[in-house]
């Protein structure tokens, strides 16, 4: 039956327009120690902040994917329905494979919304990494270039919006992230001093703003300040 699964029943019970977001999080070995601890703390802060906003709590849906190795930590669900996560650092940085999976999850979720008559805002993919894309041996891989044309098409057709965040990345890593976000009119934002909680507060505030906007309305996002870097001009 169409509404036999818990997911279907949840969609039937709550007809609120959805604000879907994929958190695409680097958990490779280089995130060990303080970085992964701050990332987990930031995720807790994000969850708490979304739940403080009644409208966002009914609208914002998260899918969490970690990479190193690529793992779906949680499928799309309202934030209150997600179990708290405790991520661990391990493995290399298969960024291309992780981003491909995120794009697939967005496509599948939009299909589910349409199947159940749920309206939705343009999905977000929020990519956060501290390194460069690698192959299985941990060597730099340029295979991310295979995604540039699909990303350009996705941006032109407004299929989703991609934001890229670099955690003290190298010049080469920043070049990769800039290339990935360029089709969406953005660039890599540098996350200085491991300010994960501030970054996730910006994200929750921005998603909350989107969830309260009118269909078709251009949403001017809050300009995040991370370290000394003010990233302005994000418009959805």
Kindly label every feature range from the protein language model.
Residues 58-86, 174-180:
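Short beta-strand-loop
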Residues 131-183:
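VWA/integrin I-like adhesion module and closely mimicked acidic/polar interface patches used
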Residues 1-22, 28-37, 51, 110-121:
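Acidic, polar low-complexity linker/tail segments
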Residues 50-57, 107-118, 151-157:
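Alpha-helix termini
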Residues 39-52:
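An active-site-proximal "capping" alpha-helix that borders the catalytic cofactor pocket
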Residues 25-28, 39, 64, 102, ...:
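DG-centered beta-turn motif at the end of beta-strands
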Residues 83-121, 161-175, 197-202:
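Von Willebrand factor
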Residues 161-225, 235:
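Von Willebrand factor A/integrin I-like adhesion domains
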